[in-house]
Amino acid sequence: MSKNIRINEIPSGERPREKLLFYGAQFLSNEELLAIILRTGNKDSNVVELSYRIIHSVGGLNGLFKASAKELMEVKGVKEAKATQILAMCELYKRFKVSELAQVKISKPSDVAKLVLDELRMLRQEVLILINLDTKNKVISKKEIFKGGLNSSLVHPREIFREAVKDSAASIIICHNHPSGDPTPSRDDINITTRLKECGKMMGIELLDHLIIGDNRFISLKEKDIL
């Protein structure tokens, strides 16, 4: 799309809002959907071009939902108003996902993988996620606990069980990713799991599983009889 074309010069059938009403939202690109939310561009770009620049500057949709106001405003053409529009949209989506979690019951490792695989598999650094469960193995919450190089000296059970107690969890599952794409457990992974299992016994909050996420695959330490 030429930068000389303004949004009102685009044929009406190709404008994002009109396309959504005629074809349905599922037929629009990510950039077109964001353009509808932002509504206007600026003197240099129409709103579709601006949306393209935003999404690609922050690393795609995954980056968009994790971007801060400061990071968004570093994109040319994005001021405070548009940054807050994007942040509000992202927060609404996150709240919807939290409400959706309440309907999820965990009965096998693949149920857990569905909750975290897409979120963790493409990250460039290790992230540890805690899933708190009630007495019927329904998900209470899903929380990011730690980010960075995971090892047994840095991941302290106190941080994990503090969140479990706060949410009145009956049991927990932890998940973390291997940026290499290989989910084979390391010695540190096994040590962390052992420590958490013992702490859980003392606190009456059972560690049900530890999933390691690789590139579109995962390993359950429970299934491997490590837990």
Swiss-Prot record:
Keyword Hydrolase on entry: yes
MF-aspect GO terms: metal ion binding; metallopeptidase activity
GO biological process assignments: proteolysis
Annotated MPN domain residues: 105-227
Annotated disulfide bonds: none
Matching InterPro entries: MPN, RadC_JAB, RuvA_2-like, UPF0758, UPF0758_CS, UPF0758_N
Positions with a binding annotation for Zn(2+): 176, 178, 189
Family designation: Belongs to the UPF0758 family.
Protein name: UPF0758 protein CPF_2399
The species this protein was found in: Clostridium perfringens (strain ATCC 13124 / DSM 756 / JCM 1290 / NCIMB 6125 / NCTC 8237 / Type A)
